[in-house]
């Protein structure tokens, strides 16, 4: 398995955390230097997601987070990789993670590597809807289909066709159709046209900050992105109101799809309920 950990080159503490977390289990990995607000970021947006550059209320750090994933996908496509596992540098790994991440036979036995799919490894401890699927369990973990919003990009496996799908569509999206990258990947805001997202259950990983919150403890690593979002939230709220007025003029065609999706989720919830994806 090609395991890529998105991390700032200067984040010594987090990189030490990753080296210990992955290294102690014999899991191979490589760092991918995260983007930050810079000329390099502007160039990457211009090449891959031009609408993101003009987005009025996503912060520079949020744009950099978005583009770190997008640039990594583009790199994987250039290298001809059939799939990659992507992590962020505050990730915690669960029991037996090496059996999933040190080799990939289990993945190729269960998924068509030439199709578009995502295997979500992470939980955010939110109540979500998952629907049982025919994919066989592996090492006491199941692979139900994720049928509701489940944010976060601390750990996932994405196939070549899924990377191509997102990059092709991101390239032509206007600013008003773009949100944070986790919302594009794991909510119904963005129409993935039937591309399946499988939720590993119990989850194989979680973000350290959210696990600490779940346990009512203090975070040891914190979240730079969460801090940035909090600092800019009030200012961006006023910008968002003006931006949403503009977006409303062109959204009527999409509202029908959203209503249908909400109705579908309501029907699924009646059958399957909502539950927290545990981490172990």
From Swiss-Prot:
Adds the first galactose to the lacto-N-tetraose chain in lipooligosaccharide (LOS). It holds the Pfam family Glyco_transf_25. This is Lacto-N-neotetraose biosynthesis glycosyltransferase LgtE. Pathway: Glycan metabolism; lacto-N-neotetraose biosynthesis; Bacterial outer membrane biogenesis; lipooligosaccharide biosynthesis. It comes from the Bacteria. Belongs to the glycosyltransferase 25 family. GO terms for biological process: lipopolysaccharide biosynthetic process. The keyword Transferase applies. Its EC number is 2.-.-.-. The gene is lgtE. The keyword Cell cycle does not apply. GO terms for molecular function: glycosyltransferase activity. Keywords: Glycosyltransferase, Lipopolysaccharide biosynthesis, Transferase.
